[in-house]
From Swiss-Prot:
Keyword Oxidoreductase among UniProt keywords: yes
Known partners and oligomeric status: Homodimer.
Catalysed reactions listed for this entry: (S)-4-amino-5-oxopentanoate + tRNA(Glu) + NADP(+) = L-glutamyl-tRNA(Glu) + NADPH + H(+)
GO terms (BP aspect): protoporphyrinogen IX biosynthetic process from glutamate
A matching Pfam family: GlutR_dimer
Family: Belongs to the glutamyl-tRNA reductase family.
UniProt protein name: Glutamyl-tRNA reductase
Transmembrane regions: none
Record InterPro entries: 4pyrrol_synth_GluRdtase (IPR000343), 4pyrrol_synth_GluRdtase_dimer (IPR015896), 4pyrrol_synth_GluRdtase_N (IPR015895), GluRdtase_CS (IPR018214), GluRdtase_dimer_dom_sf (IPR036453), GluRdtase_N_sf (IPR036343), NAD(P)-bd_dom_sf (IPR036291), Shikm_DH/Glu-tRNA_Rdtase (IPR006151)
Role summary: Catalyzes the NADPH-dependent reduction of glutamyl-tRNA(Glu) to glutamate 1-semialdehyde (GSA).
Keyword annotations from UniProtKB, A to Z: NADP, Oxidoreductase, Porphyrin biosynthesis
Length: 414
């Protein structure tokens, strides 16, 4: 049996999301990049998709026990049991889940676009650290294509669907015109950058970016023509509209009572809940109402996903067949080269023009193999599902690159 065949049953997903454990506890499951490198086993591929809504590991392994080993490693690196509330998906279920995520169906805000970029970044990261190979790459690239297809064939992403778009929309409802409002963004990371861009498009002019790292705040503020300051929540409290999006490892909360509106997107929240504060969970309620209005689009998207899962299986079948054919032809080429050398040595006994003789034999044998095997291989490629075993059998006959001694002796006698 050939070892490098891709099997859908070898795909796994270890899932923690806002749906399964809640946003308030999700941060406890975050996996630092250095820990991801440590938990990965040599014969297991892994990619981490980690956002404010989810912590998900996508894996490819032929050994089911490796999943339990990785869960144990997660417990070890976190210093507590986090494996008991993990959802483990396998095969088509894991593929379906990633497709749902890529399509925006499993997002806090239905149809959001941001997730496609996050999936692409997850793939780039795992390749950069040599944590995954083509098996994961094929799946992630397919998921990105599915996400784009769903958005092009449905209205799932039409309107204000992204969580940050909903946050901006809520601020417009409460504050009205943003042109002269004093606005603060706490955090200069990916979310802070998106908020700054969207607020710029909505007319915000008097905006300051606060961050623990002033250089990062300056870099972002200069991009949009805003102000930048080192993070000081006493100063932040003097603004009319405040957005907060920072990594918060401290469960204690502070109060911001002067702003008219505070939208805290941090997990867990930074600010104590009062009447002027909106959490990520509050935006989720708005998102749920959007979902109710997009039920028909969700049905269409799910139908597309089911169809694309079948296409992915066909893609793998064709991919596997091409691998088998390539392997088979390499075995044939090995035999051909050996026969050329043997014939060449025989001819040398009677002829002196070595270069011309070997070129003639080489062209002759190559042409012979091509003529013999091209019709066979074309027929095999037409039906990869049912004829894969034939190619595997042919490879086994050659016994990983060489005829057995018994077969070789029989051929030489002939």
């Amino acid at each position: 049996m050939v070892d490098n065949i891709i099997d859908t049953d070898n795909y796994y997903a270890i899932v923690y999301t806002y749906k399964t454990i809640g946003l308030s506890k999700l941060y406890e499951h975050y996996i630092p990049e250095k820990d991801l490198i440590n938990i990965r086993f040599s014969d297991t591929q892994v990619s981490l998709l980690q956002t404010c809504n989810r912590v998900e590991l996508y894996l490819y392994t032929k050994d089911r026990n490796k999943i339990n080993d990785i869960l144990s490693k997660l417990n070890e690196t976190h210093g507590k049991d986090i494996s008991s509330n993990a959802i483990v998906l396998r095969g088509k279920d894991a593929i379906n889940h990633l497709y749902q995520v890529a399509s925006g169906l499993d997002s806090l805000a239905i149809g959001e676009y941001e997730i496609l970029g996050q999936i692409k970044e997850a793939l780039t990261s795992c390749k950069k650290h040599s944590l995954c190979n083509e098996e994961i790459e094929l799946l992630f690239n397919a998921a990105i294509k599915v996400g784009r297809k769903v958005r092009s064939l449905t209205n799932i992403s039409k309107g204000k669907v992204g969580i940050y778009s909903i946050a901006i929309q809520k601020s417009l409802e409460v504050m009205g015109d943003l042109t002269d409002i004093k606005i603060a963004i706490v955090g200069a990371g990916e979310i802070g950058s998106k908020l700054a861009f969207m607020l710029k498009n909505n007319g915000a002019r008097n905006l300051t970016i606060f961050n623990r790292n002033l250089d990062r705040a300056l870099e972002l503020s200069n991009k949009f023509g805003y102000n930048a300051e080192l993070l000081d929540f006493q100063k932040v409290n003097e603004y009319d509209l405040v957005f907060i999006a920072i990594n918060n490892s401290n469960p204690s909360q502070l109060r911001l009572d002067k702003p008219k509106l505070v939208i805290d997107l941090s997990v867990p929240p930074v600010v104590y809940k009062t009447s002027n504060v909106i959490y990520l969970d509050d935006l989720r309620v708005i998102s749920d109402n959007i979902i109710l209005n997009k039920r028909e689009d969700i049905k269409k998207a799910e139908a597309i996903i089911n169809e694309e899962i079948q296409k992915f299986e066909s893609l793998l079948n064709n991919y596997n067949m091409n691998r088998l054919v390539s392997r088979f032809m390499s075995e044939i080429e090995w035999v051909r080269e050996k026969e050329v050398d043997r014939a060449f040595n025989e001819i040398l006994k009677n002829y002196a023009d070595k270069d011309n003789i070997k070129e003639i034999i080489d062209k002759m044998t190559y042409s012979l193999i091509k003529k013999v095997f091209s019709p066979i291989l074309e027929d095999l490629r037409k039906d990869p599902n049912n004829k894969k075993q034939i190619v595997e059998y042919l490879i086994e006959v050659f016994q990983n690159g060489q005829f057995s001694d018994t077969k070789t002796q029989k051929i030489e006698k002939q």
